[in-house]
Amino acid sequence: MNDHQKNHATSQDDNTKSTPSKNSKHIKIKLWHFILVILGIILLTSIITVVSTILISHQKSGLNKEQRANLKKIEYVYQTLNKDYYKKQSSDKLTQSAIDGMVKELKDPYSEYMTAEETKQFNEGVSGDFVGIGAEMQKKNEQISVTSPMKDSPAEKAGIQPKDIVTQVNHHSVVGKPLDQVVKMVRGKKGTYVTLTIKRGSQEKDIKIKRDTIHVKSVEYEKKGNVGVLTINKFQSNTSGELKSAIIKAHKQGIRHIILDLRNNPGGLLDEAVKMANIFIDKGNTVVQLEKGKDKEELKTSNQALKQAKDMKVSILVNEGSASASEVFTGAMKDYHKAKVYGSKTFGKGIVQTTREFSDGSLIKYTEMKWLTPDGHYIHGKGIRPDVSISTPKYQSLNVIPDNKTYHQGEKDKNVKTMKIGLKALGYPIDNETNIFDEQLESAIKTFQQDNNLKVNGNFDKKTNDKFTEKLVEKANKKDTVLNDLLNKLK
């Protein structure tokens, strides 16, 4: 699963209504794309998750005649293989395989069965520090992909981006492997390294990342001139309380315009998203709609909006790593015209899941319902489009250049364009973005090699490629161009 997965239920005194379920459940948002948080992040994921706190007994009630016959067939096969197969079989493995098969048939990347060990791993780290690389992952179509790297995490610093596909861990293929197994491969001791082979576009590249301890802060506040920037990293217990305190502090400092930075926020607890919306939206208004077939429920605000928040203009900054609970909050603020949304289109996670635990500690997680914004927008697979688009600089979204090939002057290759864009961003004289390796590029590479104590030959070889990537990541981490663009727009 992931190094830090938020699977704790919301507290009973939360203002969030329960989901339309007969069981005692608590609503929680989870992105279920398991966070590679090897450095720590945590699958704080962000699909809305409904957590069941009851243990499941062996019940056959509610089944029709055909379903009872099917269940009887399954029991017969289980008993036959357990008793008569010529080699001794593990009862637990037979059971797990049967359940895995049923869940796999759903063809739903967010539904799965977890063993007791996997469930324990899933539930661990509800709070505190974690060791990992800080990248949230999910499995879809047999591929492991990154949902979002955690802010300031080793993964982000190494250049991992949302939607990167992880094909290998330490040069071992992870294609088709269970997500929890991949996470185990990525996790390790603090200070050790893990190499991820990532595919971005059509290119693959190895990225070496140093594992570290991560402590995830829910809300961070920074005064930028006459604007307050509040970075919300995830929706966890008391995130709304932390945000309230930060807004009150900003108000006392004379701040009347705040930016809520939700970039790469994978989600978390749904009730916290509702409470956070309640800071800006008055009592009795719908924040999110839940639908399961014909059954519908609306989660509404229960208090008046925060007085200090009413005095402020609000801008929300999002990107493709903003998911689930982030989208619930953003969707509500957008529908009620409480904020202007900037950045790029969000991830698009609009489904609700339920987890039910068995008496042996194992667990099944399955998609149960979907959610919609107050105005009825279903964003699953679509995301939320910002009111004002702020593009990420070209050099921050370049495809990786394979490091198993050396490029020379005269070659024609799409990766040559990537070299030119990157070197231009680093300040080297490039006046075209063609895919032809020309004299100007060779000259720029020679200067780059000289500046970085590399062998000066004008060829784009592995060592040059590695340093090229390192410098681009360093530049991206040093200057937040998207936030700066937004701050300039607000002047």
Curated annotation (Swiss-Prot):
Keywords, sorted A to Z: Cell membrane, Hydrolase, Membrane, Protease, Serine protease, Transmembrane, Transmembrane helix
Location(s), subcellular: Cell membrane
Active-site residues from the entry: S324, D335, K349
UniProt GO cellular component terms: outer membrane-bounded periplasmic space; plasma membrane
Coiled coil: none
EC numbers on record: 3.4.21.-
TM segment ranges: 31-51
CDD domains to which the protein is assigned, alphabetical: cpPDZ_CPP-like, Peptidase_S41_CPP
InterPro entries in alphabetical order: ClpP/crotonase-like_dom_sf, CtpA/B_N, PDZ, PDZ_6, PDZ_sf, Peptidase_S41A, Peptidoglycan-bd-like, PGBD-like_sf
One Pfam family it belongs to: PG_binding_1
Comp. bias (Polar residues): 8-22
Gene Ontology terms for molecular function: endopeptidase activity; serine-type peptidase activity
Annotated GO biological process: proteolysis; signal transduction
Record has S-adenosyl-L-methionine as a keyword: no
Enzyme class: hydrolase
Stretches the record annotates as Disordered: 1-22
Membrane topology: Single-pass membrane protein
Domain PDZ: 119-201
SUPFAM superfamilies assigned to the protein according to its UniProt record, in alphabetical order: ClpP/crotonase, PDZ domain-like, PGBD-like
Alphabetized PANTHER family for the sequence: CARBOXY-TERMINAL PROCESSING PROTEASE CTPA, TAIL-SPECIFIC PROTEASE
Family statement: Belongs to the peptidase S41A family.
The protein's name in its UniProt record: Probable CtpA-like serine protease
Species of provenance: Staphylococcus epidermidis (strain ATCC 12228 / FDA PCI 1200)
